[in-house]
Amino acid sequence: MTDQGENEKKQRRSNATIAVACLSFFVCMIGAAYASVPLYRIFCQVTGYGGTTQRVEQYSNTILDKTIKVRFDANIANGLPWDFKPMQREVTVRIGETTMIKYEAHNLFGEETYGRASFNVAPGRAGAYFNKVECFCFTDNTLKPGEDLELPVVFFVDPEFVNDPDLKDVKTITLSYTFFPIDKPKPVVNAKAVGSTRNGG
């Protein structure tokens, strides 16, 4: 009887240990899932992996005679009552040449709405060579009822594009944006104005 009781206690302890281990693993997996999204975004922005374009501060110093066609795609996620489209569907540019195109957004709703865009490039490998000098991605945008907004994109294709053997047959690059609904952005406090008020002026 005593041996049976001891065995039952050992079994309960073993079950408890397994339960704790499973719970810990589950919690860790949930945390990793939440952390993986921003980490993956950072990784893609740095490397151009997965069709993420490169953000640069300067223009290309080299312009080649070789040209490539760039197409523009626009999408709206569920819950955002906007009309969103490129003002030009495609352009043919010289590789290394800086080009500006524009998208436009229109609020179809009777109230103020808020959106933020993400982007992607196809084929994915071309993202490492698609350099944006100016864009509206990851910026909070507010549109009043019926308001229109022009959204410029300034870009060039890195001349190193032609040296990548995996892209030798690529004649067209597609830049795609998707707008998602977001909560109303919090107002930015003017620190100077607050300080002046506290000082009596």
Swiss-Prot record:
Entry-linked Gene3D superfamilies: Ctag/Cox11
One MF term in the entry's GO annotations: copper ion binding
Residue ranges that the UniProt entry lists as topological domain Cytoplasmic: 1-13
Membrane-spanning ranges: 14-36
Lineage start: Bacteria, Pseudomonadati, Pseudomonadota, Alphaproteobacteria, Hyphomicrobiales
InterPro entries: CtaG/Cox11_dom_sf, Cyt_c_oxidase_assmbl_CtaG
UniProt keyword terms in alphabetical order: Cell inner membrane, Cell membrane, Copper, Membrane, Signal-anchor, Transmembrane, Transmembrane helix
Cell compartment(s), UniProt: Cell inner membrane
Positions in the Periplasmic compartment: 37-201
Membrane disposition: Single-pass type II membrane protein
Name this polypeptide is given: Cytochrome c oxidase assembly protein CtaG
Pfam families (UniProt xref): CtaG_Cox11
Family listed: Belongs to the COX11/CtaG family.
Xref: HAMAP family: CtaG (MF_00155)
Gene from which the chain derives: ctaG
Protein task: Exerts its effect at some terminal stage of cytochrome c oxidase synthesis, probably by being involved in the insertion of the copper B into subunit I.
